[in-house]
Design a protein with these regions (language model features):
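A structural signal for beta-strand and strand-to-loop patches characteristic of beta-rich domains
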Residues: 1-323
């Protein structure tokens, strides 16, 4: 391992170069190389900005971004070309208010990454302004808050190009369900325990919403207790050996419905019948039919675990834990 510095001459021509290192100055031996790109340095002639109005956006709304560019010496980039690209990615929601900081909001199950949505090419107006629009909706993970971002690339008459960006959060519904941790047990819960939780409904501004504006009368809250099971699948291979793999199954152990209550904290309870990992899911819809989903995980201890002796492909052996 070695390191060092190489100072480029002032009159070095821009282009692609390769730095090669030979041992013992023998160019017939093995060498290591590194690609280097040398470019002209040019001071910026103009500045640009992209802004999105700071309002609350919900899935299905249209987002409009304002783009502007001006010369640093004064004057707008009238007629300059620009391109825009929109992307989105899941970001989730968490409360900043200390009163709600320990609550879980939104789903856990599901995966989505950054996705490209749309691109456009346009020209700035006489006062150096432009815009870009994007319709939201059809997000992959139901009940998840998404971050929508726009990047604008602006090119002036001298072919200098700079980029600017802006982003905003798009909420899945008019409100979220905040779900507490287990309230009546410290440490791990045990199989057969009744577990108490609390939930509260909050809007994106972290306030308790007016029920008449976000839900219909007698809106139901679905409560699902889901057990995470790993099924052992074994197959006999070509040479008689046993090949083992595990497949996850999410088994709904308990499902109930009750009237959704909007106000202060509201109690709910579940009773796991087995040991292992569990998922508790609360779901409903707002007045526009948008999904509101919150999930949390917890673990339950028990003596349910059994082990399959894989030393023989022709017999199954069990060892009891009691005589």
């Amino acid at each position: 391992t070695f390191w060092g510095q190489l100072k480029l001459p002032e009159d070095f021509e821009p282009g692609s170069y390769m730095i090669k290192y030979y041992r013992n100055n023998n160019k017939n031996n093995d060498y290591s190389s590194c690609a280097v790109q040398v470019q002209f340095f040019e001071r910026l002639r103009f500045e640009s900005s992209a802004t999105i109005p700071q309002i609350t956006y919900y899935s299905g709304d249209k987002i409009t971004a304002e783009i502007q560019a001006n010369y640093l010496g004064g004057g707008s980039l009238a007629g300059a070309t620009y391109s825009t690209d929109w992307t989105r990615e899941p970001i989730g929601f968490s409360a900043k208010n200390q009163k709600y900081k320990d609550l879980r909001f939104g789903p856990i199950i599901g995966y989505d990454g950054r996705n490209w949505l749309n691109s456009e090419n346009n020209s700035l107006s006489a006062d150096g302004k432009g815009s870009a629009e994007q319709k939201t909706g059809d997000e992959k993970i139901k009940g998840m808050a998404y971050s929508y971002a726009v990047q604008a690339n602006i090119t002036d008459a001298g072919n200098q190009r700079i980029s600017t960006s802006a982003r905003t959060i798009v909420h899945p519904a008019k409100f979220y369900i905040g779900l507490s941790n287990i309230k009546n047990i410290n440490g791990f819960a045990k199989k057969g325990d009744t577990l108490n939780f609390e939930y509260i409904c909050l809007n994106p501004e972290e306030n308790i919403p007016n029920p008449n504006t976000v839900i219909f009368d007698k809106t139901k809250l679905k409560i699902e207790l889901i057990h995470e099971e790993w099924k052992q699948i074994q197959q006999i291979g070509i040479n008689g050996e046993i090949n083992t793999r595990y497949q996850r199954e999410m088994v709904t152990e308990e499902e109930t419905e009750e009237l959704l209550k909007i106000g202060n904290f509201n109690p709910i309870s579940v009773k796991p019948k087995n040991g292992g990992a569990y998922l508790l899911r609360l779901s409903t819809t707002d007045k526009n039919g948008k999904d509101v989903i919150t999930e949390t995980r917890f673990y339950v201890t028990s003596s349910d675990f059994t082990w399959f002796n894989r030393e023989s492909s022709e017999k199954i052996e069990f060892q009891t834990d009691k005589q």
